[in-house]
């Protein structure tokens, strides 16, 4: 209460920010008459003038009013569109490293031209980030005439483009592309084998469209480039046969309770756990299938991977539903994005889950993948010097933007007042009653010519509604992941009088729904239309537009509440754009996922006690409030998950930055011989110390062991025992020096054969490949550590601190291994002629090119990389899965260190 009173007196932070910015808007408006008098050439010359002023030390903030005024004037001349004052406010918010919340239809695409132009003046590049390739291309083509009029180059960074074209796109002043593509290019650049292979410049300014979708909904999805791991498809098929034998454990107070089941399900956490009874049955079935020996336990160390397969299969059957979480198309399991309802072609679940779903659906099981490089969007976008974003719905997530990305949210006012009517929710007892009520509402609305947009949360639900509409004889369009190609056409015509459109979640985001339909789409269908035809189409459209306005505008029906209020607001935001009339209502039932999981049984019991008849609905502010509270609970839980993920990923991020910085330094330097010499000294010192401890007596020296180690690991045959017999005065220090000198001599002879330049190339190649190989293994080990670290909590230890401590120890060990393997590899390589080194180099280059091509072709989360060939080239010894582990534990390789590779 007190806060509300103070806000009334002093204004909110948002009001104060906008008040300050309105003064600048007045300045910009004051410049308009003078700029109108300039010729096109004089207006174009302003860009060069601004750049010259920047070089002399003026700041972007000083240039902002004049630069914005120039863009507005250019837009009037090129598009015949003048930026509204609220769009100038939005542009200033975006330049201030903030998030601008601008309602649907307020012209976010045109607003983005202002800060994009201003920040591109620095010459460091501006990245405009969109959610899909279609929007990136559309926005780039729409804005290209304006930017090119002002002397700015514009390019699109598309998936599947060859490296030279990508390099050109990044060299442009303003680059449009998707979040995935920017992230993958960053990872690919950090896997490059020469500076010429890199495509990105230093990350300067990112302007993120639909920022909530990219920085919040996608934040839990890491971008992963991976290579194939070993084939275990048969095991997935065998384990898949076991799952149908298991019975789900119901709650004791539920109607279906029949005693202890084989597994329990936690829908909130999306987890499944075997019960004692389930464990016994699974072990029996595994023995029967011949996968496990009798008397063995599923929890024994040797069966950890088997346990992992069982859990993955169980999750695939219980938690993942066809046409909700994924679709099966052309014998392939394709993930459906839970937030947008779009299919994510090429993306695969990790940890064997995707293979388990493939086994469940009986399609071909593709090999598991092994991570070669990964980064989360949270960490990628924090690499930019300057970050800003815009969306129609950010205010509900303002706290998360502020705490994770240090971005403040500013709500930009609408150009015209909002007059949409948001009607209270209606809650029914069953799903069937709810669908009947929705059909009745649609009949009433379409009878008076009002267009209706029905929002569903999954493909399955959209098909249920579609069947009900077909049964009722109502014509309609369905917009979901299965009908991806027609998306923009369907959305464009969804405002036609009496049109009914069913859309999964926010499919079609970024395309406006025009009341009366889109006359532009009709014109585009005609071949070379005449002026009269265009005038006639516009006149017909105006009649339809007026008819829709008279009927009440676009009506939105939500078929259930989403986990996030923001996505509900996005659905509502499709109606009432730019001051148009409109209405919205959500229909819910007690069988909806959100109500079942989070709204307590009290509501259902209360509805029963009230003696509600079938078909009756509850409509009360209390119910709406209870649902909003349930959504808040889910939002805060999801925020905690993302925050937790970020805290763990920050540890990996520090290591990633260190490795990538080191790698880029290696790439940029032509000669790394000094580094190699320094590493050689460290490695030989450690090797000799292991057999000749410092300041020790001669009796403690292990000379045969040292000779054998030098021969096996460094291909160095030295008669150390003979030296000691012949020269009794040789002491520890002089012996060390002699061994090191001998190693250098052998290496120098190799260099003489092939030439210094060729040897430098070879050293660099070995260093980069070994670094990549060990980094890949380190990522896998970090994944395993991350999965089990929460168990440390039972020992009264802080899992996060334990993770930091152990991962640092693993990182230090990895760097030691790097030194050892590099020296071992370059010492063992037998070089006789320069042609041989050239052949090795050529082989490595071809491998790198093939890898890059595969990544470009697949343009997916799970990009393919040939890791096996790298191992052969660097001379690593291949260990069979059933061979004894080289670490000396006595276990088979597959049950020891083989699990990490």
From Swiss-Prot:
Residues engaged in binding ATP: 87, 105-109, 512
Keywords from the UniProt entry: ATP-binding, Cell inner membrane, Cell membrane, Cytoplasm, Membrane, Metal-binding, Nucleotide-binding, Protein transport, Translocase, Translocation, Transport, Zinc
Required cofactor names: Zn(2+)
Catalysed reactions, semicolon-separated: ATP + H2O + cellular proteinSide 1 = ADP + phosphate + cellular proteinSide 2
GO molecular function: ATP binding; metal ion binding; protein-exporting ATPase activity
Keyword field contains Transport: yes
One GO-annotated biological process of the protein: intracellular protein transmembrane transport
Top EC class of this enzyme: translocase
Signal peptide: none
Co-factor binding details: May bind 1 zinc ion per subunit.
Residues involved in Zn(2+) binding: 885, 887, 896-897
Region described as Disordered: 855-891
Membrane topology label: Peripheral membrane protein
Regions that span the bilayer: none
Induction entry: Repressed under conditions of excess protein secretion capacity and derepressed when protein secretion becomes limiting. This is regulated by SecM.
GO cellular component: cell envelope Sec protein transport complex; cytosol; plasma membrane
Function comment: Part of the Sec protein translocase complex. Interacts with the SecYEG preprotein conducting channel. Has a central role in coupling the hydrolysis of ATP to the transfer of proteins into and across the cell membrane, serving both as a receptor for the preprotein-SecB complex and as an ATP-driven molecular motor driving the stepwise translocation of polypeptide chains across the membrane.
Self-association and partners: Monomer and homodimer. Part of the essential Sec protein translocation apparatus which comprises SecA, SecYEG and auxiliary proteins SecDF-YajC and YidC.
Name used for this protein in its record: Protein translocase subunit SecA
Organism: Cronobacter sakazakii (strain ATCC BAA-894) (Enterobacter sakazakii)
């Amino acid at each position: 209460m007190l806060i509300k009173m103070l806000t009334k007196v002093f204004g909110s932070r948002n009001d104060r920010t906008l008040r300050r910015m309105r003064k600048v808007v007045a300045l910009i408006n004051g410049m308009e008459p003078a700029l109108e008098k300039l010729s096109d050439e004089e207006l174009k010359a302003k860009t060069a003038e601004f750049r010259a002023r920047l070089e002399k030390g003026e700041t972007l903030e000083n240039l902002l009013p004049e630069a914005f005024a120039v863009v507005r004037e250019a837009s009037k001349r090129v598009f015949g569109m003048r930026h509204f004052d609220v769009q100038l406010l939005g542009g200033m918010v975006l330049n201030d490293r903030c998030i601008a919340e601008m309602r649907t239809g307020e012209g976010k695409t045109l607003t983005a031209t202002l800060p994009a132009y201003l920040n591109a003046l620095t010459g460091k590049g501006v990245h405009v980030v969109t959610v899909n390739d279609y929007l990136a291309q559309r926005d780039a083509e729409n804005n290209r005439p304006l930017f090119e009029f002002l002397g700015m180059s514009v390019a699109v960074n598309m998936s599947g483009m060859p490296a030279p074209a990508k390099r050109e796109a990044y060299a442009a002043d303003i680059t449009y592309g998707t979040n995935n593509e920017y992230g993958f290019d960053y990872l690919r650049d950090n896997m490059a084998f020469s500076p010429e292979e890199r495509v990105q410049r230093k990350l300067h300014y990112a302007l993120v469209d639909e920022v909530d979708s990219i920085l919040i909904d996608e934040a839990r999805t890491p971008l992963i480039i991976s290579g194939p791991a070993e084939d275990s498809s048969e095991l997935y098929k065998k384990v898949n046969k076991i799952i149908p034998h298991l019975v789900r454990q119901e709650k004791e107070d539920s109607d279906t309770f029949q005693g202890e089941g084989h597994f329990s399900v936690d829908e909130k956490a999306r987890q499944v756990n075997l019960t004692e009874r389930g464990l016994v049955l699974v072990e029996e079935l595994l023995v029967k299938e011949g996968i496990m020996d009798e008397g063995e336990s599923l929890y024994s160390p040797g069966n950890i991977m088997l346990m992992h397969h069982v859990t993955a299969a169980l999750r695939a059957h219980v938690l993942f539903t066809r046409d909700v979480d994924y679709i099966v198309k052309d014998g392939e399991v394709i993930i459906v994005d839970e937030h947008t309802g779009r299919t994510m072609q090429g993306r695969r679940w990790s940890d064997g889950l995707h293979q388990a779903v493939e086994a469940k659906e009986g399609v071909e099981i593709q090999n598991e993948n092994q991570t070669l490089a990964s980064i989360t969007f949270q960490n990628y976008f924090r690499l930019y010097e300057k970050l800003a974003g815009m969306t129609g719905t950010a205010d509900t997530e303002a706290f998360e933007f502020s705490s994770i990305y240090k971005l403040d949210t500013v709500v930009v006012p609408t150009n015209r007042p909002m007059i949409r009517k948001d009607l209270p929710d209606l809650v029914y007892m069953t799903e069937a009653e709810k669908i009947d009520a929705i059909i009745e509402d649609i009949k009433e609305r379409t009878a008076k010519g009002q267009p209706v947009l029905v929002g569903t949360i999954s493909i399955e639900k959209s098909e249920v509604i579609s069947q009900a509409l077909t049964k009722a004889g109502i014509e309609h369009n369905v917009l979901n992941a299965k009908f991806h190609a027609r998306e923009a056409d369907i959305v464009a015509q969804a405002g036609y009088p009496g049109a009914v459109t069913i859309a999964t979640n926010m499919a079609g985001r970024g395309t406006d729904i025009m009341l009366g339909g889109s006359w532009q789409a009709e014109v585009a269908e005609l071949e070379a239309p005449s002026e009269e035809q265009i005038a006639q189409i516009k006149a017909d459209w105006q009649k339809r537009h007026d008819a829709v306005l008279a009927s009440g505008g676009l009506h939105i029906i939500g078929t259930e509440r989403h986990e996030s209020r923001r996505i509900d607001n996005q659905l509502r935001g499709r109606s009432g754009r730019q001051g148009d009339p409109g209405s919205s209502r959500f229909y819910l039932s007690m069988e909806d996922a959100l109500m079942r999981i989070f709204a307590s049984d009290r509501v259902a019991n209360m509805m029963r006690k009230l003696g509600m008849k079938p078909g009756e609905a509850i409509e009360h502010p209390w119910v709406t409030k209870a649902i909003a509270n349930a959504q808040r609970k889910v939002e805060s839980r999801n925020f905690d998950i993302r925050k937790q993920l970020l805290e763990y990923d920050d540890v990996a991020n520090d290591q990633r930055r260190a490795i990538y910085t080191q790698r880029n330094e290696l790439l940029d330097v032509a000669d790394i011989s000094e580094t190699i010499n320094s590493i050689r000294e460290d490695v030989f010192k450690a090797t000799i110390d292991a057999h000749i401890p410092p300041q020790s007596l001669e009796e403690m020296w292990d000379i045969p062991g040292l000779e054998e180690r030098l021969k096996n690991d460094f291909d160095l045959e030295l008669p150390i025992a003979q030296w000691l017999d012949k020269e009794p005065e040789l002491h520890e220090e002089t012996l060390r020096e002699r061994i090191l000198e001998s190693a250098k001599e052998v290496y120098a002879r190799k260099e003489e054969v092939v030439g210094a330049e060729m040897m430098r190339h070879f050293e660099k190649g070995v260093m980069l490949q070994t670094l990549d190989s060990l980094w890949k293994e380190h990522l896998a080990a970090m994944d395993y550590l991350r999965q089990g670290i929460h168990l440390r909590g039972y020992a009264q230890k802080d899992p996060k601190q334990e993770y930091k401590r152990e991962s640092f120890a693993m990182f230090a060990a990895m760097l030691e291994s790097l030194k050892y393997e590099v020296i071992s590899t370059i010492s063992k390589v037998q070089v006789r002629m320069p042609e041989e080194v050239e052949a090795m180099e050529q082989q490595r280059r071809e491998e790198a090119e093939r890898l890059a091509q595969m990544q470009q072709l697949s343009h997916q989360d799970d990009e393919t990389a040939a890791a096996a060939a790298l191992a052969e080239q660097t001379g690593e010894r291949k260990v069979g899965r059933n061979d004894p582990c080289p670490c000396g534990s006595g276990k088979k390789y597959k049950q020891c260190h083989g699990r990490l590779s």
